[in-house]
Amino acid sequence: MTRTLQALITLVVLSADTTGAEFTLRIIDESDQPISGAKLNIILHRQNDPRYSSSQLIEDKTGADGTFSFSAKADMSLSRIDVFKEGFYPCLIMETQDGIYSMAPKQSYTFGMPRRHRPTSLHARKVNITSKPGQLPENTWLGYDFEKGAFVSPHGKGEIADIRFHLSSSQDGPRVTSEEMARDRANPDLQKWTELDFTRLHNDWKFALQVAFPEPGSGIIAEPRNWPYCELRMPPFAPEGGYLPSLEMKLSTRGPFPHAADRDYPGYFLRTRVKLAPDGSVASAHYTKIVGYLYYVHHQLSFTYYYNPTPNDRGLELAPGKNIFKWRRGISPIEEINYFPEYEP
C-alpha cells in the first residue's frame, strides 16, 4: 500500500469520526415559559462501548430563551441529562416518553421542570388492594376515603366517600387450547386452584372501571402534562374547573393496552367533598391528585394518591417528611416506602 493511499484512508477515518450531530435542549416550566440559567450536566456515551472512559460530560447553562445547543460526534448518543435551578424541582432525564434512548433519536428535546411553589403536608398513599374474599367485590360500588386511607363501610374503616369505584369483567374467549387446559388441571402444583382461578388463567378478559362521585360538583380530570423524570411529576396545583362527574375506562387482555409503563402515564386531578353555594358555584372543596394510572383487573385495584386536607387549597406539592400518613407497627421499611411516599414517585 502506498503512503498516499494510507494517508487518504486515515483522512477518511478522521473525517467520519469528527462528523457530529447538533443537539438542542429546551427547558420550560409548568406554564411552558422558558427557564434561563438552568444548570445542565449532559452525559454522552459512545455507541456499543461500555467503557466509562469513552463517555463525554458537558456542563453548561441554558440561555435567555431556555435553550442550550451543543454538538457531539456521530458515534456518541445522549445517555443522561441532569437539570438544576434554585426554586425548581430537579430533573434526572434518562428515559422519557419521547425517549433519548429511542431507535431514531431526535436532535431537539423539550423538557419541563416545574417551579417549587409551596410544598405542604398531604395524605399520600399507594393503594394496592388484591383479591381477598369480601374485600373488593366486582359489580359493586365501592367508596374510598382519601383522608382515612380506607374503603368505607362495609369494606373498610373509611367514613366519607371521596370517590366511588365500580369494577366489572367479562370473558372474551379462550386463550389456550383444550389440551393446555387439561395439562394445567393435571399439574400437581395447581391442585389447590379453584375453578375461578382456572377460568381466569385460560380465558381472555375484558375489564371496565367506572369512577363516580357522591355529590354534585365533585369530579375528575385527566392531566396530560407529565414529567416522569422530575421530582414533581404533575403540575403543582389542581385546576379550578373542568372536572367530569364520572369516568369509565376499559381494557382487554387481547390489547391494545392504554399504557406501556407506570412512569409514562400522566395522572388525574380530583375535586371532592364539594359544598355548593346557593348560586351553584363551588363554596368549598378538597383537591387530590392520582399520579400515574388507575390499575384494575378482576379483584385488584391500585393507584397512588395525594390528598390535601385543607379546604379550597389546590396546592398538591408534598413537602419532604410531611406525609400525614405515618409509619405504624407491622409495616416493613419497604412497605413504608411503597405505601407512605415521602416524595412524588
Regions found by a protein language model. Give the residues of each.
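Beta-strand-rich domain onsets/edges
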Residues: 9-33, 41-43
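Sec-dependent signal peptide recognition
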Residues: 1-10
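Short, acidic Ser/Thr/Gly-rich low-complexity loop/linker segments typical of extracellular
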Residues: 47-71
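A short, solvent-exposed loop/turn motif at the edges and junctions
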Residues: 55, 75-99
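Short, ordered, surface-exposed loop/turn motifs in non-cytosolic proteins
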Residues: 31-50, 76
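Extracellular beta-sheet/turn segments enriched in Thr/Pro/Gly and aliphatic residues
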Residues: 97-129
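A domain-level signal for the mature, folded cores of soluble proteins
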Residues: 116-279, 305-315, 323-345
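Structural motif
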Residues: 23-36, 116, 130-135
